[in-house]
């Protein structure tokens, strides 16, 4: 099975909110864009929360959320996964991202939101203990996954939960 690699974090300039996924799905990896699957509601939610047109370019969407102090990244740097499903991540293949460099650059980080349960579990298992001292003043919160695989929760309920990032 081939090892897949995630992306670098988006702009960290002035960031105080980190939204963490687990590992980009196949559609995102192919397009080299966070949350690129057409049925992933992440960008639809961001557009509604921060009042921009969801159809603007990917680069413009990144600029809009960066202006709100938000940076996107994933817990994992590398892993093996035969599909886009988090449940298919081969545990023995997991390599977390380098959070030491990230936290050094983003000392003003105040909130970390996990886009789904798997991102939170991977962070807890592979990252949080190592960085306990950097995380003492950081709020950690899990939000419902925006992935189409988490279709049991409707859009309006997801949007309601995600409103927490603007509070």
Please identify what each model-predicted range represents.
Residues 28-90:
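Short, surface-exposed acidic-centric catalytic microdomains
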Residues 16-22:
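Short, hydrophobic/glycine-enriched beta-strand segments
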Residues 1-13, 37-38, 85-97, 124-167:
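C-terminal capping/extension of enzyme domains
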Residues 67-122:
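Internal catalytic-core helix/loop-beta-alpha segment
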């Amino acid at each position: 099975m081939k090892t897949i690699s995630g992306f670098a974090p988006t702009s960290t300039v002035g960031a105080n909110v980190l939204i963490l996924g687990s590992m980009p799905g196949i559609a995102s990896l192919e397009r080299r864009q966070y949350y690129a699957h057409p049925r992933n509601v992440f960008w639809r939610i961001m557009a509604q929360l921060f009042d921009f047109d969801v159809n603007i370019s990917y680069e413009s969407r990144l600029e809009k959320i960066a202006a709100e102090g938000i940076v996107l990244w994933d817990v994992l740097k590398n892993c093996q996964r035969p599909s886009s499903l988090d449940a298919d991540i081969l545990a023995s293949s997991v390599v977390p991202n380098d959070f030491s460099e990230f936290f050094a650059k983003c000392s003003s980080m105040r909130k970390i939101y996990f886009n789904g349960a798997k991102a939170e579990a991977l962070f807890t298992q592979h990252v949080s203990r190592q960085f306990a001292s950097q995380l003492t003043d950081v709020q950690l919160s899990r939000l419902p996954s925006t992935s189409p695989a988490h279709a049991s929760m409707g859009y309006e309920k997801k949007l309601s939960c995600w409103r927490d990032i603007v509070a």
